């Protein structure tokens, strides 16, 4: 009696047949960009012995994207009000001051200034 074909074998055969139909080209998986590696690096700097679940990472990624979009939109609005066609670090700084509350804005501005200084000095 011959062995029964497993579900895995059937799936492999189906995928091979599909690849043959599409002109023998394997479809490359589309790259999904995220901030997860940077969030993980910051987590390890702050709490070296703490991990993060994929759900929590997804939430953090959404949070970073949301804040990025808010700052970009506010900076764009500020540039438009002042009839400027370029968003500079000044617009970003003002947008951060407008969007973030009190002490958080002060820390964000100082960290941003530090990052820009480090970048310009390394050039």
Curated annotation (Swiss-Prot):
Record-linked InterPro entries: Histone-fold, Histone_H2A/H2B/H3, Histone_H2B, HISTONE_H2B_site
UniProt PTM comment: Monoubiquitination of Lys-118 gives a specific tag for epigenetic transcriptional activation and is also prerequisite for histone H3 'Lys-4' and 'Lys-79' methylation.
GO molecular function, one term: protein heterodimerization activity
Keyword Acetylation: no
Domain of life per record: Eukaryota
Protein keywords: Chromosome, DNA-binding, Glycoprotein, Isopeptide bond, Methylation, Nucleosome core, Nucleus, Ubl conjugation
Keyword Ubl conjugation annotated: yes
Modified residues (N,N-dimethylproline): 2
Cross-link Glycyl lysine isopeptide (Lys-Gly) (interchain with G-Cter in ubiquitin) placement: 118
Function: Core component of nucleosome. Nucleosomes wrap and compact DNA into chromatin, limiting DNA accessibility to the cellular machineries which require DNA as a template. Histones thereby play a central role in transcription regulation, DNA repair, DNA replication and chromosomal stability. DNA accessibility is regulated via a complex set of post-translational modifications of histones, also called histone code, and nucleosome remodeling.
SUBUNIT field: The nucleosome is a histone octamer containing two molecules each of H2A, H2B, H3 and H4 assembled in one H3-H4 heterotetramer and two H2A-H2B heterodimers. The octamer wraps approximately 147 bp of DNA.
Family recorded in the similarity comment: Belongs to the histone H2B family.
Protein name: Histone H2B
């Amino acid at each position: 009696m011959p062995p029964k074909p497993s579900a895995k074998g059937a799936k492999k055969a189906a995928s091979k047949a599909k690849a043959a139909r599409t002109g023998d080209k394997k479809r490359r998986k589309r790259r999904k960009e995220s901030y997860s590696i940077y969030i993980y690096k910051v987590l390890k700097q702050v709490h070296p012995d703490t991990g993060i679940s994929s759900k929590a990472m997804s939430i953090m990624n959404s949070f970073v994207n949301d804040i990025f979009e808010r700052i970009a939109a506010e900076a764009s609005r500020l540039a438009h009000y002042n009839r400027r066609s370029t968003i500079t670090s000044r617009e970003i700084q003002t947008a951060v001051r407008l969007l973030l509350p009190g002490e958080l804005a002060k820390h964000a501005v100082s960290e941003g200034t530090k990052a820009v200084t480090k970048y310009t000095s390394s050039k």
